[in-house]
A protein has these predicted regions:
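Concave beta-strand-loop units of leucine-rich repeat
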Residues: 1-208, 217-225
């Protein structure tokens, strides 16, 4: 097993103690521990896995404290933390991970105050913030993520007022606003972002006329409704 590259333990009963046996898998690049009872203590056993490129911890018992054990995984490109107890301040431990491109924080306790730790991850090109506690007040700060191409804000309270900054993300290709309180005012905002290729407005207040106008003015964009 020394040369194992991928290991999937999704939905198993693997424990923190059990993860101790993974510490010698020095070649592993992809590890999926989603939907397991793993806690911060278990992550301490993964700190030596410095070849990891993808780590999935969604719906585990991991908190901000556990992220300190990931701080030396400089090859990490993707990190799944959705559905965990993360509040956000633990993301400061990931600042040195210059290869980190994708992070999932959906369904966590992330809020306006802790978003500042997210925007320090400058290499991100995909960010999932579905179902978090973010509001219009903090969303403009995302402009500093200049490499961002995919942003999911579904099921948040973000409205048109918080999206006036959208033109500041010139590389944004996909925007998820499913079940957000946005209406036809969104049309003028996103039409200033002609590079958009996917826009999810399912469950919003956008009218039929609004959708038609979007499709007319953004002919290259797939409108999901």
């Amino acid at each position: 097993l020394k040369y194992l590259k991928k290991l999937g333990l999704l939905g198993t009963n693997v424990t923190d103690e059990g993860l101790r046996y993974l510490s010698d898998l020095s070649s592993i690049q992809v590890l999926n521990l989603a939907y397991t009872p793993v806690t911060d203590r278990g992550l301490a056993n993964l700190a030596s896995l410095l070849q990891l490129e993808e780590l999935f911890l969604g719906d585990t018992l991991v908190t901000d404290g556990g992220l300190a054990h990931l701080g030396m995984m400089t090859k990490l490109k993707g990190l799944g933390l959705s559905g965990t107890r993360i509040q956000g301040h633990g993301l400061k431990h990931l600042k040195r991970l210059g290869a980190l491109e994708r992070i999932g924080l959906s369904g966590t306790l992330l809020n306006d105050q802790s978003l500042k730790f997210v925007i320090e991850l400058k290499s991100l090109n995909a960010l999932s913030l579905r179902g978090t506690q973010l509001t219009d007040a903090s969303i403009p700060a995302l402009q500093s993520l200049e490499s961002l191409q995919v942003l999911w804000l579904d099921r948040t309270s973000v409205s048109e007022a918080g999206l006036e900054w959208i033109t500041g993300l010139s590389g944004l290709r996909e925007l998820g606003l499913r079940n957000c309180p946005v209406g036809d005012g969104l049309v003028e905002l996103v039409c200033n972002a002609p590079q958009l290729r996917v826009l999810n407005v399912f469950g919003t207040k956008l009218t039929e006329d609004g959708v038609a106008e979007l499709q007319k003015r953004l002919p290259d964009c797939e409108i999901i409704r």
